[in-house]
């Protein structure tokens, strides 16, 4: 298991330390470390503090902030940047950009679970500038070229 340094910036997280819900969970929940209930109006995007900072330190890893499926499907609450990417050398608080793409306001309570954090491997590639690529079966065929969407 990869060990990650974490700072708990909000003392309330001592009671609900970020962790994995099940042995098969890929992501751990991020919570809304806000002091009082707030409304996210339709079309509005707000930055919500998570109360944690992490330092991955290893350039072979990054963290991704992803939406919670239930919030998006049931309430229209998704990430304003769709996916948040946390680089291995970032050490600041993780902020969650919450966008209400729904038709109704959404009430966010303090310490509510709002997103998930997934640690992923990263490959930093070197690039060779070429004039042409070796032919492949797909070539330059793009959107929808491999079958019905």
UniProtKB/Swiss-Prot annotation:
Enzyme class, UniProt record, top EC level: hydrolase
Cofactor: Mg(2+)
Biological or metabolic pathway of the protein: Pyrimidine metabolism; dUMP biosynthesis; dUMP from dCTP (dUTP route): step 2/2
Keyword list, A-Z: Hydrolase, Magnesium, Metal-binding, Nucleotide metabolism
Entry GO MF terms: dUTP diphosphatase activity; magnesium ion binding
EC number: 3.6.1.23
Binding residue positions for substrate: 68-70, 81, 85-87
UniProt catalytic activity: dUTP + H2O = dUMP + diphosphate + H(+)
One Gene Ontology term from the biological process aspect of the record: dUMP biosynthetic process
Functional description taken from the UniProt entry: This enzyme is involved in nucleotide metabolism: it produces dUMP, the immediate precursor of thymidine nucleotides and it decreases the intracellular concentration of dUTP so that uracil cannot be incorporated into DNA.
NCBIfam families in alphabetical order: dut, PRK00601.1
Family as reported in the entry's similarity comment: Belongs to the dUTPase family.
Protein name as annotated: Deoxyuridine 5'-triphosphate nucleotidohydrolase
Organism encoding this protein: Nitrosomonas europaea (strain ATCC 19718 / CIP 103999 / KCTC 2705 / NBRC 14298)
Phylogenetic classification of the source organism: Bacteria, Pseudomonadati, Pseudomonadota, Betaproteobacteria, Nitrosomonadales
Gene label: dut
């Amino acid at each position: 298991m990869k060990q990650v340094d974490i700072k708990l910036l909000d003392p309330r997280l001592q009671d609900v330390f970020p962790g994995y819900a099940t042995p098969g969970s890929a992501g751990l929940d991020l919570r809304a470390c806000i002091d009082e209930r707030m409304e996210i109006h339709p079309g509005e995007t707000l930055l919500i503090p998570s109360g944690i900072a992490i330092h991955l330190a290893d350039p072979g890893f990054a963290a991704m902030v992803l939406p919670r499926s239930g919030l998006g499907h049931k309430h229209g609450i998704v990430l304003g940047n769709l996916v948040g990417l946390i680089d291995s050398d970032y050490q600041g608080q993780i902020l969650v950009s919450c966008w209400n793409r729904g038709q109704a306001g959404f009430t966010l309570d303090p310490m509510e679970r709002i997103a998930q954090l997934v640690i992923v491997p990263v490959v930093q590639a070197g690039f060779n500038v070429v004039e042409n690529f070796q032919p492949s079966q797909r070539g330059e065929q793009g959107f929808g070229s491999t079958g019905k969407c």
